[in-house]
Swiss-Prot record:
Keyword Cell inner membrane tagged: yes
Family label: Belongs to the ATPase delta chain family.
Compartmental location: Cell inner membrane
Entry GO CC: plasma membrane; proton-transporting ATP synthase complex
NCBIfam families: ATP_synt_delta, PRK05758.2-4
Protein's recorded name: ATP synthase subunit delta
Function: F(1)F(0) ATP synthase produces ATP from ADP in the presence of a proton or sodium gradient. F-type ATPases consist of two structural domains, F(1) containing the extramembraneous catalytic core and F(0) containing the membrane proton channel, linked together by a central stalk and a peripheral stalk. During catalysis, ATP synthesis in the catalytic domain of F(1) is coupled via a rotary mechanism of the central stalk subunits to proton translocation. This protein is part of the stalk that links CF(0) to CF(1). It either transmits conformational changes from CF(0) to CF(1) or is implicated in proton conduction.
Membrane topology, from the record: Peripheral membrane protein
Keywords: ATP synthesis, Cell inner membrane, Cell membrane, CF(1), Hydrogen ion transport, Ion transport, Membrane, Transport
InterPro entries with a match to the protein in the record: ATP_synth_OSCP/delta_N_sf (IPR026015), ATPase_OSCP/dsu (IPR000711)
Length: 181
């Protein structure tokens, strides 16, 4: 089984248990803390992936790091991952869990690129427009891309909305080349 599929299955199971047990908010907070630690410690990620470190030691490492920092139920889950030889999946499980939470809350991520920095008002207007268009809450990541010349591009999942001047010029070039002389 691929690691992505396994990560998704563990994330779904954790979400279901957390909802049924009424501790979803706490688990979500705990996983955020764990994700921050994993992002800041390449050595920990390597240790969790290492086949040279046995299951018990991985479990002890996780327990030492997260004891008194995460809820007991979350600790049971991460130790379960270690004992099932799936500690290397922890970051992937957290990522999948966050995606499931977003899906549950009707939130989608949008990657917005613009030629110049958008004002707060422009960014808010764009996010509102995307929200109306998709019927979902938008979490936008704004970035500059000077190659655009002007305008914006928005990527939501597999959909790209290209309102850039460079795209408009490319389309104009194609239409001019396609016309018979």
């Amino acid at each position: 089984m691929s690691s992505a599929i396994a990560s998704r299955r563990y994330a779904v199971a954790l979400l279901e248990v957390a909802v049924e047990g009424n501790f979803l908010e706490k688990v979500t907070e705990d996983l955020q803390k764990i994700q921050e630690v994993l992002s800041g410690s390449h050595e920990l990620v390597l240790a969790l992936k290492s086949p040279l470190i046995n299951v018990d030691l991985k479990s002890k490492i996780l327990e030492e790091i997260f004891r008194n920092k995460v809820d007991e139920k979350t600790m049971v889950f991460i130790k379960l991952l270690a004992h099932k030889k799936r500690a290397a999946l922890l970051a992937g499980v957290i990522s999948e869990f966050n995606a499931l939470i977003d899906e549950r809350n009707g939130v989608i991520n949008a990657d917005v690129k613009s030629a110049i920095k958008l004002s707060d008002e422009q960014a808010k207007e764009l996010v509102n427009s995307l929200s109306v268009r998709t019927g979902k809450k938008i979490r936008a990541k704004m970035r500059l891309d000077e190659n655009l010349i002007g305008g914006v591009t928005v990527k939501i999942g597999d959909t790209i909305i290209d309102g850039s001047i460079s795209h408009q010029l490319e389309m104009l070039r194609h239409s001019l080349v396609a016309q018979p002389a």
